Amino acid sequence: MLIFEGKEIETDTEGYLKESSQWSEPLAVVIAENEGISLSPEHWEVVRFVRDFYLEFNTSPAIRMLVKAMANKFGEEKGNSRYLYRLFPKGPAKQATKIAGLPKPVKCI
């Protein structure tokens, strides 16, 4: 559970929001800080991308899917696992979806 702006925000045991409708960009900053990440414009690009992906496909992207989709949209420079791991060192799919207020990707351990 998180306390944000005086409200209790329910999370699962790993810190993923139970209700993605409670997500906001200011809340994302708090979640990122809990993950040890200070959000840069590059982080926001990925966070917004995974949110859009989720809205379109109704699923959070696992790492392979995330890399491929990022490459299709942004090119090889940003659509590769090295770039994404620099931004999200504990796992791009896990951390980006958590910060984006989405469910944990199905194929993530």
From Swiss-Prot:
GO terms for biological process: tRNA wobble position uridine thiolation. Gene3D superfamilies: 3.30.1420.10, DsrC-like protein, C-terminal domain. GO terms for molecular function: sulfur carrier activity; transferase activity. Keywords: Cytoplasm, Transferase, tRNA processing. Its EC number is 2.8.1.-. It is an enzyme of class 2 (transferase). Pfam families: DsrC (PF04358). The active site is at residue 108. Changing residue 108 to S: Loss of activity. GO terms for cellular component: sulfurtransferase complex. Signal peptide: none annotated. Its main location: cytoplasm. It is found in: Cytoplasm. Interacts with the TusBCD complex. Interacts with MnmA. Part of a sulfur-relay system required for 2-thiolation of 5-methylaminomethyl-2-thiouridine (mnm(5)s(2)U) at tRNA wobble positions. Could accept sulfur from TusD. PANTHER family: SULFURTRANSFERASE TUSE. This is Sulfurtransferase TusE. It comes from Escherichia coli (strain K12). The lineage of its organism: Bacteria, Pseudomonadati, Pseudomonadota, Gammaproteobacteria, Enterobacterales. The gene is tusE.
